[in-house]
Amino acid sequence: MKKLIAIAALLISSVATFAQQPVGSFSIQPKVGLNIASLTKADDTDPRFGLVAGAEFMYQASDMLGVSFGALYSMQGCTGTTDELGKDVDVTLKLDYINIPILANVYVAPGFAVKLGLQPAFCINNKVKAKSGSNSAQTDGPDENTFDLSMPIGLSYEFSNFVIEGRYNFGLTKAFKDMDNKNSVFQFTVGYKLPL
């Protein structure tokens, strides 16, 4: 019986630890993490690993629903290797964006949220870097669409104000004006939620 009471007390304290923000409250969450970015219809390329960092604001509309929006600096694009005159050349397409995720956060269990929404974004950097041995060069990338739209889908886990999240951003619009490639980005972040 003592074991049963101890287990019940532990479960109750765990639920309290994982509780969301009070209904009607606002919070801000600075966050930082890793992007694994690629482009659709670019079969001979590899992902570009890059930084994602920024902050998201959330309104806790109910016990099960929060609505959030944010601003994130996001390093995207892809990498690859080509052969020029018998030498391997490593090529990196650097597409950097300011992403503005607008998400519904549905809490399916204490501390766990499923996230879905839309993400407008603005391209702020478009460069191609080529490197062979000790030689490197950089030039402007293909003619980009400065506005991008994607659909983020993710899962997050909250514990004592820390938020661990995995998200996939599915590109809805073309990244370039004259090509059909779209952004495809896996994103892993750690944040800290601060009540406002």
Language-model regions, residue ranges each:
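Short glycine/proline- and aromatic-enriched beta-strand/turn motifs that initiate or cap beta-hairpins
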Residues: 20-60, 64, 68, 171
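Bacterial Sec-dependent N-terminal signal peptides
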Residues: 1-27, 31, 190, 194-196
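Flexible, solvent-exposed loop segments that connect beta-strands
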Residues: 38-45, 75-96, 124-147, 174-181, ...
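Residues on the lipid-exposed face of transmembrane beta-strands in outer-membrane beta-barrel proteins
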Residues: 30-34, 51-59, 71-73, 100-106, ...
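A short beta-strand-loop micro-motif that forms or neighbors metal/cofactor-
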Residues: 44-45, 108-128
